[in-house]
Every structure is written in C-alpha cells, then in structure tokens.
Amino acid sequence: MRFTEHEMTAALTGAAKTVLAARRRDVRRVRVDIDTVWEQMDRHARFVLLDGLGDQILPVLVALPDVEVAPGTRPSYSDRSVAEVVEALAGEELGRLRRAVMVRARTALVQSALAALPPRTDPDALTGPDRLE
C-alpha cells in the first residue's frame, strides 16, 4: 500500500501512544491523558520508542496490498490479511509458538497503527483558504 509520509508518521505515532498507554499504569487507570504523557516525554525517549516500533510496523504497512480508499475514509484491512503479511515478513528463526505470538502481537500493533491513520483527502479537490492575502 502506498502511504504518504504524513500518514506513516501518524500511524507510527498512534501505535507508539498505544504501546506507551499499555506500559504506564497512570494512563491505564485514566489518571493522566496519553497525549499529556506523550508531550511530557523528552525527544530522545520518543525517538527510542518510535525507532523500536518502526522496524516492526513500517515494513508491514508498505507490504500491505493496495486497496481503494474513498476520500474521507481510512484504509482498513482484516486481521487475517494483516497477519498474512506479517507471517510473510517474519523470519524462520523463531519456533512455532513464538512465531504465533509474534504474529498476533504485531498484527494488533499494525491494526492500532491503521486506526491512527488520518482520513484520506480527495486529491482532485481544491482545498485551501477562501482568499489568498
């Protein structure tokens, strides 16, 4: 699937926030908003998290099959189609059980990244300010 740089960044950031929310007890107990925690993180901590997830998510996003996406909607894939791509990209060095766990976890991670994608805009629509000053 072809994604723009902005879409890839939004997907990766959305998945990173999901992982961060799962790691932090204060976010899980709804004491702190995940966006607040994300903004309070220093750049290096964000980079480390995004770098680790990028190796897992980006190859799968690129390998997903092309689908027709109507303007104003997000691309969506079934868990089965994402799992097939993840299995195809997974190496043979893992055992059967570890491979199955990795495929399920990475499929969930990619689905959270896809959920964070912004809606597609119509490339033929002229959007911009009403007046140029």
Language-model segments: residues:
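Alpha-helical propensity feature that highlights long, continuous alpha-helices across diverse contexts
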Residues: 1-133
